[in-house]
Design a protein with these regions (language model features):
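Aromatic-lined carbohydrate-recognition surfaces of secreted/lumenal glycan-active proteins
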Residues: 76-87, 216-222, 292-323
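Second-shell loop/turn segments in exported
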Residues: 19-21, 185-186, 293-295
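N-terminal cofactor/phosphate-binding cores enriched in small/glycine residues
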Residues: 16, 20-47
Length: 323
């Protein structure tokens, strides 16, 4: 246990949030003093929500906060976005739609064979393009064997022509789309360029203004992939608790993800991607592990790794907790 004397000597292991949403300097100053009196020598500024974040009034308020902290020999951290959760990049993603995250979703229909010269009308989305179509043969209650890739049998982007033998089958059409979660347009955690928007919009201007002061670093608040159940837009239902195999779940995607899965999962072929949603014998386990390993690696390199490296190079601290 650390004593009040140790905290007063400059040992900091806590940094409570200082929520700011207006220009009441007197109240902000009083809250900073109370934080100091509690034994904490650091705090983290959070916009909740300060509409002019990174605007003229914001800089006046931050100048006051940093000045007050220096007078009390305190350290200042910043929650690194306009609002919770980290990922909006202060609205920069909306201005750069090409850097929005991509997702894959699967539309499925169960069919009883035999079927000859059958046609299946695929669900189409205005923001989506077909990645692949595949057929699974049902072997039990929601268990399947991989049957075949039928992407080449799709005509006009919306109609699948297919012949099927005796049995029960599931036809899956996987599309790549863009979407929104409940928090708005977010950066793409699989894209280094997309994450860079956060640095350019928030990190760079704060570092330039407060370099050499008591400004300590940045804190990312619950950054996430933001994927959920897809119904034309992503909603909270699966954002925090989604699991591989969950029906309707949207999975984060990158243009080269298929090639990466082929390297990670022996025997992988394009149509195997449907095993992210379905229990496919001899396929699902390998594909799901390969997929999670790949997106975890990219998240670490592009988000946490890029931000922390940027901070280290400038003598700043970086912290986060991740959903």
């Amino acid at each position: 246990m650390f004593t009040r004397q140790q905290y007063s000597a400059g040992i900091n292991y806590t940094m409570p949030f200082l929520w700011v949403n207006n220009n009441d300097y007197e109240s902000v100053g009083r809250e900073i003093e109370k934080i100091k009196e509690s034994g904490s020598n650091a705090f983290c500024v959070e916009s909740r929500i300060y509409e002019e974040f990174c605007g003229a009034e914001w800089w006046k308020l931050m100048d006051f906060i940093v000045g007050k902290a220096e007078s009390l020999r305190m350290k200042v951290w910043l929650l690194d976005d306009k609002h919770f959760p980290t990922g909006g990049a202060n609205g920069a993603v909306e201005r750069n739609p090409q850097l929005r995250p991509k997702y894959i979703v699967s539309d499925e229909v169960d069919v009883r064979g035999p079927v000859r010269r059958g046609k299946v009308l695929l669900q189409t989305r205005p923001d989506a393009r077909l990645y692949c179509a595949a057929v699974l043969r049902q072997t039990g209650n929601e268990t399947f064997e991989y049957y075949k890739d039928v992407t080449d049998c799709v005509v006009d982007g919306s109609t699948l022509k297919v012949d099927l033998p005796q049995g029960y089958f599931r036809v899956c059409a996987v599309s790549v789309c863009t979407g929104y979660d409940e928090s708005g347009v977010m950066i793409d955690m699989l894209s280094r360029a997309s994450v860079r928007l956060l640095i350019d919009e928030v990190y760079e201007p704060h570092y330039a203004r407060y370099k050499g002061t008591c400004f300590e670093g940045f804190f990312s608040d619950e950054p996430r992939f933001g994927n959920g159940v897809y119904n034309g837009a992503l909603y909270r239902g699966g954002i925090y608790g989604g699991n591989a195999g969950e029906k309707g779940l949207a999975y984060n995607w990158a243009e080269d993800m298929g090639d990466c899965l082929a390297r990670r999962a022996p025997g992988y072929e394009r149509g195997h991607i449907v095993s992210l949603w379905n229990d496919v014998k001899g396929v699902s386990a390998g594909v799901r592990v390969a997929y999670m390993d790949e997106i975890t690696r990219r998240y670490g390199e592009n988000f946490s790794g890029q931000l922390s490296a940027w901070c280290r190079e400038r003598g700043l601290q970086y912290a986060s907790h991740i959903i």
